[in-house]
């Protein structure tokens, strides 16, 4: 992290009163000493709240499930990593030697986590209103492209995007049974999601349909959707 932090502050649009908070937010767990994981936890909560509040105001007729899907798109790791790269955040990260050699400063998850940590650091440094203003400014371009049409995605896509937004492994689908004659088969599929203790299940006249039903059941089990969306 040899580049001047003042340059990063200009890119972020915020100047820290406590520079140590900023440095901590940029410190990966592979680096010796304290790291940014607690700030990341805090920043993730703030990000989800600010994005949810803004979507609630922007889409007054949207249902709960639609709002959840829009928020998942806004806060997913891919989106945050794109923002982080726009700030050249990788130039400022404090990484352990092994992580540095393996190119950790370019890794999507590390960049996204550091950006969330910076949100947490700004909150501690200046309070909620400033943190909200920065988050909304950074996400302005993403908000401009959002419509409720974005919620009309199939359950498998919605489940994948939700899991990606949480930095989780993608779901695994398995056909566990096929019943009926060749011209009239019913497929039975199980969907394994790392956040759930039990696999969700679905059935349909094709494997694709059964997977969609299983994905929809997983979304309900996760509390992302309520079955009426």
From Swiss-Prot:
Gene3D superfamilies, per the entry: 3.30.160.20, Ribonuclease III domain
PROSITE patterns listed in its UniProt record: DS_RBD (PS50137), RNASE_3_1 (PS00517), RNASE_3_2 (PS50142)
Main localisation: cytoplasm
HAMAP family per record: RNase_III (MF_00104)
Active site: 44, 116
GO terms, molecular function: double-stranded RNA binding; metal ion binding; ribonuclease III activity; rRNA binding
Keyword rRNA processing tagged: yes
EC identifiers of the protein: 3.1.26.3
Record's subunit section: Homodimer.
The protein, known as: Ribonuclease 3
Cofactors required: Mg(2+)
Binding residues for Mg(2+): 40, 113, 116
Role noted for this protein: Digests double-stranded RNA. Involved in the processing of primary rRNA transcript to yield the immediate precursors to the large and small rRNAs (23S and 16S). Processes some mRNAs, and tRNAs when they are encoded in the rRNA operon. Processes pre-crRNA and tracrRNA of type II CRISPR loci if present in the organism.
Domain annotation RNase III: ranges: 5-127
Keywords, comma-separated and alphabetical: Cytoplasm, Endonuclease, Hydrolase, Magnesium, Metal-binding, mRNA processing, Nuclease, RNA-binding, rRNA processing, rRNA-binding, tRNA processing
Catalytic reactions on record: Endonucleolytic cleavage to 5'-phosphomonoester
Enzyme class: hydrolase
Localization per Swiss-Prot or TrEMBL: Cytoplasm
DRBM domain span: 154-224
Any Gene Ontology CC annotation: cytoplasm
InterPro entries for this protein: dsRBD_dom (IPR014720), RNase_III (IPR011907), RNase_III_dom (IPR000999), RNase_III_sf (IPR036389)
BP-aspect Gene Ontology terms: mRNA processing; regulation of gene expression; rRNA processing; tRNA processing
Keyword Transmembrane: no
Family: Belongs to the ribonuclease III family.
């Amino acid at each position: 992290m040899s580049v001047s932090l003042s340059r990063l502050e200009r890119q972020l649009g915020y100047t820290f009163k406590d520079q140590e908070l900023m440095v901590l937010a940029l410190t990966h767990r592979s680096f010796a000493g304290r790291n940014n994981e607690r700030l990341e936890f805090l920043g993730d909560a703030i990000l989800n709240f600010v994005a949810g509040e803004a979507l609630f105001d922007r889409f007054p007729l949207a249902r709960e499930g639609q709002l959840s899907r829009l928020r998942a798109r806004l806060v997913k790791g891919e989106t945050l990593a794109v923002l982080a790269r726009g700030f050249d955040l990788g130039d400022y990260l404090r990484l352990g030697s092994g992580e540095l050699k393996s190119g950790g400063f370019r890794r999507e998850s590390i960049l996204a986590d550091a950006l969330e940590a910076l949100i947490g650091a700004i909150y501690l440094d200046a309070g909620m209103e400033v943190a909200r203003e920065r988050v909304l400014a950074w996400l302005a371009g993403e908000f401009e492209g959002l419509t409720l049409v974005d919620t009309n995605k199939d359950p498998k896509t919605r489940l994948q995007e939700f899991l990606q937004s949480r930095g989780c492994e993608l779901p695994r689908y398995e056909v566990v049974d096929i019943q009926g004659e060749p011209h009239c088969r019913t497929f039975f599929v199980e969907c394994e999601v790392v956040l759930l203790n039990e696999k969700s299940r679905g059935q349909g006249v094709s494997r694709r349909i059964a997977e969609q039903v299983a994905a929809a059941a997983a979304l309900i089990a996760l509390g992302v959707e309520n079955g009426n969306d």
